[in-house]
Amino acid sequence: TGTSCISPKQCTEPCRAKGCKHGKCMNRKCHCMLCL
């Protein structure tokens, strides 16, 4: 269910949309962290 990504910046918006403050890119997928 992760958004595909190349850089962590691409994960910021989709993660914020999920209520998360931070996202990083691993294995070309976004992993959201610091979620409510």
From Swiss-Prot:
GO cellular component: extracellular region
Disulfide bond positions: 5-25, 11-30, 15-32, 20-35
GO molecular function list: ion channel inhibitor activity; potassium channel regulator activity; toxin activity
Keywords attached to this entry: Disulfide bond, Ion channel impairing toxin, Neurotoxin, Potassium channel impairing toxin, Secreted, Toxin
Keyword flag Secreted: yes
Main location: secreted
Family: Belongs to the short scorpion toxin superfamily. Potassium channel inhibitor family. Alpha-KTx 06 subfamily.
Domain notes per entry: Has the structural arrangement of an alpha-helix connected to antiparallel beta-sheets by disulfide bonds (CS-alpha/beta).
Protein name: Potassium channel toxin alpha-KTx 6.14
Species per Swiss-Prot/TrEMBL record: Hoffmannihadrurus gertschi
